[in-house]
Swiss-Prot record:
Gene: rplQ
Protein name per UniProt: Large ribosomal subunit protein bL17
Ribonucleoprotein as UniProt keyword: yes
InterPro entries documented for this protein: Ribosomal_bL17, Ribosomal_bL17_CS, Ribosomal_bL17_sf
UniProt source species: Oenococcus oeni (strain ATCC BAA-331 / PSU-1)
Entries under Gene3D superfamilies matching the protein: Ribosomal protein L17
UniProt family annotation: Belongs to the bacterial ribosomal protein bL17 family.
C-alpha cells in the first residue's frame, strides 16, 4: 500500500506526521488538509493499537514516534534513566485514549470534510476520535 508524499522530503514528511499525530492524541481532534488527515489517520490508528497492547515494548515504540516538545531537550541532555520523564503524549495515549477503544477493532478516527480553505482552496478536513 502506498503513501502520500505531501510535497515534502522524507524527513519533513516524517516530522509533519509525528507532530500532527501527537497533536491529535493530546487534543482529541485536529483541523488540516484532507491528504494530511488521511495520512495522520494511518499513524494514529497504529499508535492506538500499540496503546491497547499496553506492554513495555509497545510503550517504548510509541515513545520513539510521538513527540513532546517540552521534554525533548531534557531527553537529549539526560545523563541517566531518572532524568528521562515519560512524555505527556505517551501517558495520554496509554491512560486515556487506548482504554476508550479497548472493545473496538480498528476505526478509531473519523474524518469530516470541511470544504475549501479560503487562501488557496485546499480541501480541509477535521480528524477526530470516534466517541
Amino acid at each position: 500500500m502506498g503513501y502520500r508524499k505531501l510535497q515534502r522530503t522524507k524527513s519533513q514528511r516524517k516530522a509533519l506526521l509525528r507532530d500532527l499525530t501527537t497533536n491529535l492524541i493530546l487534543n482529541g481532534k485536529i483541523q488540516t488538509t484532507e491528504a494530511r488527515a488521511k495520512e495522520v489517520r494511518r499513524q494514529a490508528e497504529k499508535m492506538i493499537t500499540l496503546g491497547k497492547r499496553g506492554d513495555l515494548a509497545a510503550r517504548r515504540l510509541a515513545a520513539t514516534y510521538l513527540r513532546d516538545v517540552e521534554d525533548e531537550n531534557k531527553i537529549k541532555n539526560a545523563t541517566n534513566a531518572e532524568d528521562i520523564v515519560e512524555q505527556k503524549a505517551v501517558k495520554t495515549l496509554f491512560s486515556d485514549v487506548a482504554p476508550r477503544f479497548k472493545s473496538r477493532n480498528g476505526g478509531y478516527t473519523r474524518i469530516y470534510k470541511l470544504g475549501q480553505r479560503r487562501g488557496d482552496a485546499a480541501p480541509m478536513a477535521l480528524l477526530e476520535f470516534v466517541d
